[in-house]
Amino acid sequence: MINVVGLGYIGLPTALMFAAHGVEVVGTDYNKELVDTLNEGKTTFEEDGLDELFQEAVNKGIRFSHEYQST
């Protein structure tokens, strides 16, 4: 399992890419509102291809949390 800490402009696409390639991923951010938005199936910013990558990662089981994980 990989725990990506920080789900902003760098962390979110990184977490999504790992998950889309079959790695078990938990994306963690201290911002509960941001995590809740991701858990509702919505991205938090626009970038070409991000929505498709997000959907693929969700289908592969990515999880989002505001609580830090132990790996």
Residue ranges and their predicted role:
Residues M1-T71:
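Structural/interface elements that position substrates and couple domains in central-metabolism enzymes
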